[in-house]
Amino acid sequence: MAMEGYWRFLALLGSALLVGFLSVIFTLVWVLHYREGLGWDGSALEFNWHPVLMVTGFVFIQGIAIIVYRLSWTWKCSKLLMKSIHAGLNAVAAILAVISVVAVFENHNVNNIANMYSLHSWVGLIAVICYLLQLLAGFSVFLLPWAPLSLRAFLMPIHVYSGIVIFGTVIATALMGVTEKLIFSLRDPAYSTFPPEGVFFVNTLGLLILVFGALIFWIVTRPQWKRPKEPDSTILHPSGGTEQGARGSMPAYSGNNMDKSDSELNNEVAARKRNLALDEAGQRSTM
């Protein structure tokens, strides 16, 4: 199936990938060149893992996971495969986010620095917890086969909306964290004196993160770029059979079945429409 505005989609996708990749590179250069590198010894070098893993996992990889269903060349792949890729990318992002949080707590504890006192830490921890819950719920309901279509239909809009909200919260938290780190780290020269690290480099990193988030938001909210419903879906009916079978072999009304009441016909049509709606929701259980 051809995608409407395909070249515009490719341009935005390419821009998002470029900006996201630059965000990761800028973060690495920041900690390796300006902040003395990486380590795992409780020092500031361990803390430096926090921005690296957060930008790489919680920002960049999560952004890709959000739009993976909108890649038109994947529409021929099975929905189960795409769900697995979506869940796998989110799982990688979650693991990196958890490791980055551990690095912060270990650094603070070793150096007797208070934990969880800033707005950045509050919002960031809430985002991580909500993300883990979102990942668990999505895996349980949309990837495993046990959940009925009615449950998927009910949870699908919540899953989509909460995913977008969490991603937006992560972008805002990253911007707060970058600013907070600069204020705490830049003493001589101070941040307010326009040092190259802060004004010309890390501020640019913040803008890259913001632009990446905006591009992901735009791509994921365009209805014309949404993965189409699979045409060969099979819908079970209360009376047995499938929607495909019902469409392909409608009963030939003769003298034996012409006496079916209008109410029975209406009930059958209503049940069929209800199952179609549930199937539509179940097939589009992701963004």
From Swiss-Prot:
Reactions catalysed, semicolon-separated, are: Fe(3+)(out) + L-ascorbate(in) = monodehydro-L-ascorbate radical(in) + Fe(2+)(out) + H(+); Cu(2+)(out) + L-ascorbate(in) = Cu(+)(out) + monodehydro-L-ascorbate radical(in) + H(+); monodehydro-L-ascorbate radical(out) + L-ascorbate(in) = monodehydro-L-ascorbate radical(in) + L-ascorbate(out)
Q: Where does heme b 1 bind?
A: 50, 115-118, 120, 180
- The protein's predominant localisation is membrane
Q: List residues in topological domain: Cytoplasmic.
A: 1-7, 70-78, 145-151, 224-287
Compartment list: Cell membrane; Apical cell membrane
Q: Give one GO biological process term.
A: multicellular organismal-level iron ion homeostasis
Q: What does UniProt give as GO cellular component?
A: apical plasma membrane; brush border membrane; lysosomal membrane; membrane
User: What PROSITE patterns is this protein classified in?
Assistant: CYTOCHROME_B561
Q: Which domain of life is it from?
A: Eukaryota
E.C. number, please?
7.2.1.3
| GO molecular function annotations of the record | identical protein binding; metal ion binding; transmembrane ascorbate ferrireductase activity; transmembrane monodehydroascorbate reductase activity
Report TM segments: 8-32, 48-69, 79-105, 119-144, 152-179, 198-223
InterPro entries hit by this protein: CYB561/CYBRD1-like, Cyt_b561/ferric_Rdtase_TM
Annotated Fe(3+) binding lies at: 108
- Please tell me which top-level EC class this enzyme sits in: translocase
Extracellular domain ranges by topology: 33-47, 106-118, 180-197
> Main role?
Plasma membrane reductase that uses cytoplasmic ascorbate as an electron donor to reduce extracellular Fe(3+) into Fe(2+). Probably functions in dietary iron absorption at the brush border of duodenal enterocytes by producing Fe(2+), the divalent form of iron that can be transported into enterocytes. It is also able to reduce extracellular monodehydro-L-ascorbate and may be involved in extracellular ascorbate regeneration by erythrocytes in blood. May also act as a ferrireductase in airway epithelial cells. May also function as a cupric transmembrane reductase.
Q: What is this protein called?
A: Plasma membrane ascorbate-dependent reductase CYBRD1
Q: What is the lineage of its organism?
A: Eukaryota, Metazoa, Chordata, Craniata, Vertebrata
